[in-house]
Curated annotation (Swiss-Prot):
Binds 1 Mg(2+) ion per subunit. Homodimer. It is found in: Cytoplasm. One of its GO terms (molecular function) is GTP binding. This is Adenylosuccinate synthetase. It comes from Helicobacter pylori (strain P12). It is an enzyme of class 6 (ligase). GO terms for biological process: 'de novo' AMP biosynthetic process; IMP metabolic process. Keywords: Cytoplasm, GTP-binding, Ligase, Magnesium, Metal-binding, Nucleotide-binding, Purine biosynthesis.
Length: 411
């Protein structure tokens, strides 16, 4: 059976800590979408690990880790991540169906961002998915055969010829790209496998599989705040499509949310706080992107969006992250509905334009940092947790009270 860990905000919810905390109980940890535009930060024994492509289970020697078919892979960045760990042989596997991000994709991404102003990381994620959908992409499996790779590269060079100048690729692009693969393909080849068959077999044997997503539900290409979204499907349903596991294989769906809310880049954010309180949340919560180091926009918990995300994913339980960031705040707001042109909205709309938050205010608490038992939390903190659980209609299964792995309350 497989369990899914999915972000239910705009990403950066703390999925990495939860996966790291529970990964020891699983045989496989699988990253099922996105690219190196996303980042997980894990603190283990006082050491901070920033992962962009590798699944969070790499810190457990007995855990097998898979990068599945719907992930887009920068081979250079993956090789650099691999070099930071020892003994990944037979512990890390990259799907032969996963698509390869080319330097051209990053150039195209930056070019398009100048006019679209979506707020992308400019790492080539979107353009790589574009080539995938156009059936012209290079897959990881193509790197296993030099002849096939050369054929794919020649087709790529022909296709981009009209755009080389616009994207600033330079006269030596073909030579440089061949050199790029010559340098990195041999390093990555030992990890490329038919992961779909591996996971189907593992599921049939009854092995435990943990599927981890990147970004968050509200960035889903179809169901998020379009056009300010990522280029992949980020919900729990996409875990099946990417891995080859059928929907019957899914058991638990753990939705990850912060006790407040953040967003990186442009796009609507009804509960954003642009006062000094937003700055306080950013500073205390260390809200700066793992990948880009960009400051995150900060605000209050949005229950309209949270209920929508829980419904989309079929969440069976929630993980409430960074409760400690709210320590010491006298009045804590929660967005319980929107107002748009005089109308109260309690359902999440397809367009958030003109949506203003309607808040309910709670009394704060002094300290929750490092607490590991629910009964040790102050009454106001427990009331806040109970309110979220009641309004969303999904039980809270665990609460994080610091970046440390062990500072977690299990309910």
């Amino acid at each position: 059976m497989a369990d899914v860990v999915v972000g239910i905000q705009w990403g950066d919810e703390g999925k990495g800590k939860i996966v790291d905390r529970i990964a020891k109980d699983y045989d496989f940890v699988v990253r099922y979408q996105g690219g190196h535009n996303a980042g997980h930060t894990i603190v283990h024994k006082g050491v901070k690990h920033s992962l962009h492509l590798m699944p969070s289970g790499v810190l457990y020697p007995k855990c097998k880790n898979i990068i599945s078919s719907a992930v887009v892979v920068s081979v250079k960045d993956l090789c650099e991540e691999i070099s930071a760990f020892e003994d990944l042989e037979n512990r890390l596997f990259v799907s032969d169906r996963a698509h390869v991000i080319l330097p051209y994709h990053a150039k195209k991404d930056a070019f398009k961002e100048q006019s679209q102003n979506i707020g992308t990381t400019k790492k080539g994620i979107g353009p790589c998915y574009e080539d995938k959908m156009a059936r012209s992409g290079i897959r990881m499996g193509d790197l296993l055969d030099d002849k096939i790779l050369e054929e794919k590269l020649n087709a790529h060079f022909k296709a981009i010829e009209p755009f080389k100048e616009a994207y600033g690729l330079g006269e030596n692009y073909e030579k440089d790209l061949r050199g790029y693969f010559k340098a990195y393909a041999p390093k990555i080849r030992p990890f490329i496998k038919d992961t779909t068959s591996m996971l189907i077999e593992a599921n049939q044997k009854g092995e435990k599989i943990l599927l981890e997503g990147a970004q968050g539900t509200l960035l889903d290409i179809d169901l998020g705040t379009y056009p300010f979204v990522t280029s992949s499907n980020t919900t729990s349903a996409s875990a099946c499509v990417s891995t080859g596991l059928n929907p019957k294989a899914i058991n638990e769906v753990i939705g990850i949310t912060k006790a407040y809310c953040t967003r990186v880049g442009n796009g609507p954010f009804p509960s954003e706080d642009t006062t000094p309180m937003g700055d306080h949340l950013r500073t205390k919560g260390a809200e700066f992107g793992t990948t880009t180091k960009r400051p995150r926009r900060c605000g209050w918990l949005d229950l309209v969006a949270l209920k929508y995300a829980c419904a989309l994913n079929g969440c069976t339980q929630l993980a409430l992250m960074k409760l400690d960031v709210l320590d010491g705040i006298d009045a804590i707001k929660v967005c319980v509905a929107y107002e748009r042109k005089g109308e109260r909205l309690e359902a999440f709309p397809s367009d958030l334009k003109d949506c203003m938050p309607i808040y309910q205010t709670f009394k704060g608490w002094e300290k929750s940092v490092g607490v590991r038992k629910l009964e040790d939390l102050e009454p106001n903190a427990r009331e806040y947790i109970r309110f979220i659980e009641k309004e969303v209609g999904v039980k809270i299964g665990l609460i994080s009270t610091s970046p440390e792995r062990e500072d977690t309350i299990f309910l």
